[in-house]
């Protein structure tokens, strides 16, 4: 590595550390650590063993963030000092490069910790695709998104499973529900929630005109046993139907598909992936609990927005990302302004750049 490259790398590292410091709010972090430490010195702290363990775990996590930041700061300062001494002693160059590599590794892991630090980021994810109005063209767009997310999941080590599939009238899909099982599935895929817009020459239009289509993507964390969402049996209507795979393959001769309707909210979920009615009901119930939990979180967020006077409409005009196939090729995220011209690669599941840009934008916003 040339000296000029080393200098540039040190400048970039200092900028990253400044960003980390701003995101962490070190003064607040120190106060939280002191508060929890004081709680743990109380004589009756261990009377409630479960609460005590939770507090202890929270303290360890906060201390871990705090200590790692200061370790990075010390390593950065040491790297700067070695650079100053390099003019007098060339033999320090190897040690300097090793320090930079070590700092890069720590910073990368630390950045991911900060980016995926919200509740349920580490949970599995449930993702739904719903094409908008536009008939076959819109339903085909939904199918292209299904392919994109399936390829993304497979390429990134997630177990991807189709929970429910409703085929389109001529092509594509009317709706699909997927599960992504693996570390940080929800934390990564939450960036995809919103309206996705397609512009292309429709293969279903004999006049070869340009069409604009929309599809909405919903993403929810799969809830584990530590999160309780009460669903009363009296509030649920269950219907059964014959289920089949994508495109109508393997259609069952018995009604194993399950559709649950939550009467108070009107939320409808269905599962067709399991071979048994019991299995599909269990999966559908988990999906319903996730939707009810998300609904409650959205209500809380709306209350906060109302207090702030922040009104944000969710409409087809508020798309989060546009995919332009013609007259030029471009995929652009309208929240982060991150864009790529290689639309084919994006549709093959290479959306990591959009996800990274979104997570960093969330921290800076």
UniProtKB/Swiss-Prot annotation:
Q: Name one GO molecular function term.
A: translation release factor activity, codon specific
Q: Where in the cell is it found?
A: Cytoplasm
Q: How is it modified after translation?
A: Methylated by PrmC. Methylation increases the termination efficiency of RF2.
UniProt keyword annotation of Cytoplasm present: yes
Modified residues annotated as N5-methylglutamine in this record: 249
Q: Which SUPFAM superfamilies match?
A: Release factor (SSF75620)
- For the keyword Cytoplasm, the answer is yes
Q: Which GO terms describe its cellular component?
A: cytoplasm
- Record keywords: Cytoplasm, Methylation, Protein biosynthesis
Main localization, broad class: cytoplasm
* Family membership noted in the UniProt record: Belongs to the prokaryotic/mitochondrial release factor family.
HAMAP family for this protein: Rel_fac_2
Function, as annotated: Peptide chain release factor 2 directs the termination of translation in response to the peptide chain termination codons UGA and UAA.
Q: What is this protein called?
A: Peptide chain release factor 2
Organism phylogeny: Bacteria, Bacillati, Bacillota, Bacilli, Lactobacillales
């Amino acid at each position: 590595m040339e000296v000029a490259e080393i200098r540039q790398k040190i400048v970039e590292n200092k900028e990253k550390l400044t960003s980390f410091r701003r995101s962490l709010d070190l003064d607040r972090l120190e106060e939280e650590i002191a508060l929890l430490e004081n709680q743990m010195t109380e004589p009756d702290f261990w009377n409630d063993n479960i609460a005590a363990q939770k507090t202890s775990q929270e303290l360890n996590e906060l201390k871990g963030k705090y200590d790692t930041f200061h370790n990075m700061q010390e390593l950065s300062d040491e790297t700067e000092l070695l650079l100053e001494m390099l003019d007098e002693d060339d033999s320090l160059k190897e040690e300097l490069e090793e320090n930079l590599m070590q700092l890069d590794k720590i910073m990368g892991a630390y950045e991911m910790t900060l980016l995926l630090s919200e509740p349920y980021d580490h949970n599995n994810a449930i993702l739904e695709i719903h094409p908008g109005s536009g008939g076959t063209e819109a339903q085909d767009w939904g199918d292209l998104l299904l392919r994109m997310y399936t390829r993304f999941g497979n390429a990134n080590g997630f177990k991807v499973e189709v929970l429910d599939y409703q085929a389109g009238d001529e092509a594509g899909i009317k709706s699909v529900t997927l599960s992504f099982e693996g570390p940080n599935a929800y934390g990564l895929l939450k960036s995809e929630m919103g309206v996705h817009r397609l512009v292309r020459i429709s293969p279903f239009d004999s006049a070869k005109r340009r069409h604009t289509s929309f599809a909405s993507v919903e993403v929810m964390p799969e809830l584990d046993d530590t999160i309780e969402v009460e669903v009363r049996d009296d509030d649920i209507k269950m219907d059964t139907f014959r289920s089949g795979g994508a495109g109508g393959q393997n259609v069952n001769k018995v009604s194993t598909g399950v559709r649950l309707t939550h009467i108070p909210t009107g939320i409808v979920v269905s599962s067709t992936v399991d071979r048994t009615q019991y299995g599909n009901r269990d999966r559908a119930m988990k999906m319903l609990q996730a939707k009810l939990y998300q609904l409650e979180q959205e209500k809380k967020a709306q209350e906060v927005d109302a207090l702030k006077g922040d009104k944000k409409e969710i409409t087809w005009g508020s798309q989060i990302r546009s995919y332009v196939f013609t007259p030029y090729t471009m995929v652009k995220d309208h929240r982060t302004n991150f864009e790529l011209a290689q639309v084919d690669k994006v549709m093959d599941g290479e959306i990591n750049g959009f996800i990274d840009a979104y997570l960093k934008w969330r921290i800076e916003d």
